[in-house]
Amino acid sequence: MNSVSPLATQYGSPKGSQQMENRSTQSGGHEQRKMGHQDATLDGEADEVDKLKSKLLSAWNNVKYGWSVKMKTTFSRSAPVYLLGERYFFRLDDEIERFQKDFVSRVWLTYRRDFPALEGTALTTDCGWGCMIRSGQMLLAQGLLLHLLSREWTWSEALYRHFVEMEPIRSSSPPSMPLSSLATGHSAGDYQPHTQCSGAPHGDQVHRNIMRWFSDHPGSPFGLHQLVTLGSIFGKKAGDWYGPSIVAHIIKKAIETSSEVPELSVYVSQDCTVYKADIEQLFAGDVPHAETSRGAGKAVIILVPVRLGGETFNPVYKHCLKEFLRMPSCLGIIGGKPKHSLYFIGYQDNYLLYLDPHYCQPYIDTSKNDFPLESFHCNSPRKISITRMDPSCTFAFYAKNSEDFGKLCDHLMKVLHSPRAEEKYPIFSISEGQAQEYAEGPQSSSHPPVCRKKGPLVKRPSSDEFEFL
């Protein structure tokens, strides 16, 4: 009798063939699941390593910068303090309280941790690389507050926050010294008390909405996720260093692609020149690009990237810089000391007041109606000598309409060509015409032009060299 093997029997009948196929499929599926499980395990381990690195970096960062949040800042009683166009005399007790309320009301955006991972990465924190983006966010937030509310608006909770105690230096001047001697260029007769808004419910709601727009979530129009995505247009990605000029162009793109503020446009100057006709087009809504022509830009944020020296800050620009910060239309300056971005909002004597984005805070879920606002406001003013400022920076101004822009240009021309200015050539120029046509894109915009000034050539470090690491 002929013997028949089981294998032959299986292949000799459709039923046997099907059973073999099922076993093979089950075996292959098992191997695939095993390999998939191993890959998932490796991915999970890599994610855990990245999270651990982020936590260690955040912890070290807060050890390095956290102590400065609680430090006392010394202010002089004999010199006025300027904060984004507002002037305060610390010889007057009520002025100190007004300054505190004004300062705390400025939006403070810092490193965050444990937010949803940035697209295409495992990064859940910007600690160590996102400081210039945060400075740009603070500048834009100030522009939105000015656009949607007013410069007089203050946060209703500002005075209820614990304000870090300052140590004003006692003035050696006699107590009877008139106010006219406390501020250069101002007399006691033209001094007017500051008018502060009482923090109406409408203002507080607008303020809360603005904070939502900057949330570290993919759906936020001005959040870190969106700005990093827009940065790819200019050759930047998450984890890269961003300079003040690149961030200016990212802010412009963020406003162009958003629907939250259709009556606001952003202009970035070319070759350190502000072209008035181009800005007038924005006021009229006559913009050749469809994405910027929505809703007739009735207000404009003007960003002017500049370089104030070679490898270090040139002190001849000190006068103009301080004069800009005295202007009510000034939105501040993004820049910083070398490899360390800061947002400058005022000055006293030869020291700049700033907000520091380097303190790392936990992610805040702004989808909740009553999300906490405290971490978006700083209660400790900091100062830095003007001479320590990095020469690469971006100035920002706001004009609500064409008439306002005309006044701004007149003021800027007086400052730029002031007899008190030590620099023969102005920081930037204002032209009546239009900029020549140029192709927008990564190649032309990722490396914005630097100012062309007469004089010997100086080796200049990259404007993107801003970070503390």
From Swiss-Prot:
One of its GO terms (biological process) is protein processing. It catalyses: [protein]-C-terminal L-amino acid-glycyl-phosphatidylethanolamide + H2O = [protein]-C-terminal L-amino acid-glycine + a 1,2-diacyl-sn-glycero-3-phosphoethanolamine; [protein]-C-terminal L-amino acid-glycyl-phosphatidylserine + H2O = [protein]-C-terminal L-amino acid-glycine + a 1,2-diacyl-sn-glycero-3-phospho-L-serine. Its EC number is 3.4.22.-. Its main location: cytoplasm. Pfam families: Peptidase_C54. Residues 171-182 have a biased composition (Low complexity). It is found in: Cytoplasm. The active site is at C131, D356, H358. Residues 1-41, 169-191, 436-469 are annotated as: Disordered. SUPFAM superfamilies: Cysteine proteinases (SSF54001). It comes from the Eukaryota. One of its GO terms (cellular component) is cytoplasm. One of its GO terms (molecular function) is cysteine-type endopeptidase activity. Keywords: Autophagy, Cytoplasm, Hydrolase, Protease, Protein transport, Thiol protease, Transport, Ubl conjugation pathway. Residues 1-29 have a biased composition (Polar residues). Belongs to the peptidase C54 family. Cysteine protease that plays a key role in autophagy by mediating both proteolytic activation and delipidation of ATG8 family proteins. The protease activity is required for proteolytic activation of ATG8 family proteins to reveal a C-terminal glycine. Exposure of the glycine at the C-terminus is essential for ATG8 proteins conjugation to phosphatidylethanolamine (PE) and insertion to membranes, which is necessary for autophagy. In addition to the protease activity, also mediates delipidation of ATG8 family proteins. This is Cysteine protease ATG4D. It comes from Xenopus laevis. The gene is atg4d.
